[in-house]
């Protein structure tokens, strides 16, 4: 987790007045959010509040109609494919459904992007993949196929794959929601270790205790807007709005 930043620090991610519509359905309604380097941010809220859409906008997977979104000082514009490619080298994303390639071994899944995108030598790519799999506790699974792994192991491979591009920011979209309860802890422990190592993390999560434990900042989204934002002890301990109090009442214990 990060230490306090000075007021003059330029945010690593700077979002201003972001609006996103699907036809007549406005999903993001003027979102403002600033995230500093090394900060761990958890985004919470009901289903349909815009959490995952916001993450996908940050990664350039979704375009937006109004507002500004800059990453590392560079404005994100959907009509500039080269800029989007550069963005995705620096912004990794882990999805709730793993999205591993079933026909590739675990090691090949982790090696694919550095080989194709960064065109690194194969011996370098392989050594890095082995190192990353060791980092997530799966060094012995290099040659295994995805269908030979548990859901928790597959998600840890997905984390290693996202880290293979050496991203500056890691986006986590409900990374435990598809897992059986007994597998959640192994994935959260890997994410927690990344937070402790200074990775900039932006997480959509329903794991309230985990968010309270690892976050520098918690964002509560409600009906497409940032409704409350603050340090976890403040936001969880003294929610300011009826909407957040109601949400925490049935989501946290």
Residue ranges of model-derived segments:
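ABC family nucleotide-binding domain
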Residues: 10-232
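Extreme N-terminus of proteins, especially the signal/transit-peptide cleavage junction
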Residues: 2-11
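C-terminal boundary and immediately downstream tail of ABC-type ATPase nucleotide-binding domains
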Residues: 2-3, 222-223, 229, 233-253
């Amino acid at each position: 987790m990060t230490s306090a930043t000075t007021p003059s620090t330029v945010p690593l991610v700077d979002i201003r007045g972001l609006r996103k519509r699907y036809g007549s359905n406005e999903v993001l309604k003027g979102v403002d959010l600033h995230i500093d380097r090394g900060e761990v941010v958890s985004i919470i809220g009901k289903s349909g509040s815009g959490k995952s859409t916001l993450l996908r906008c940050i990664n350039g997977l979704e375009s937006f109609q109004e507002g500004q979104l800059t990453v590392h000082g560079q404005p994100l514009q959907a009509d500039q494919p080269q800029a989007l490619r550069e963005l995705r080298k620096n912004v990794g994303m882990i999805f709730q459904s793993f999205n591993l390639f079933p026909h590739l071994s675990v090691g090949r899944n982790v090696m694919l992007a550095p080989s194709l995108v960064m065109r690194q030598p194969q011996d370098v790519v392989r050594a890095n993949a082995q190192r990353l799999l060791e980092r997530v506790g799966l060094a012995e699974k290099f040659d295994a196929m995805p269908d030979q792994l548990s859901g928790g192991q597959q998600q840890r491979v997905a984390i290693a794959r996202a880290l293979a591009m050496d991203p500056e920011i890691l986006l986590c979209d409900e990374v435990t929601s598809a897992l059986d309860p007994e597998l959640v802890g192994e994935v959260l422990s890997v994410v927690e270790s990344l937070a402790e190592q200074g990775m900039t993390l932006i997480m959509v999560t329903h794991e309230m205790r985990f968010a309270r434990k690892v976050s520098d900042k918690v964002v509560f989204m409600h009906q497409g807007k940032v409704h409350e934002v603050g340090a976890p002890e403040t936001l969880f301990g003294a929610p300011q709005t009826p909407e957040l109090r109601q949400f925490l009442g049935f989501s946290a214990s």
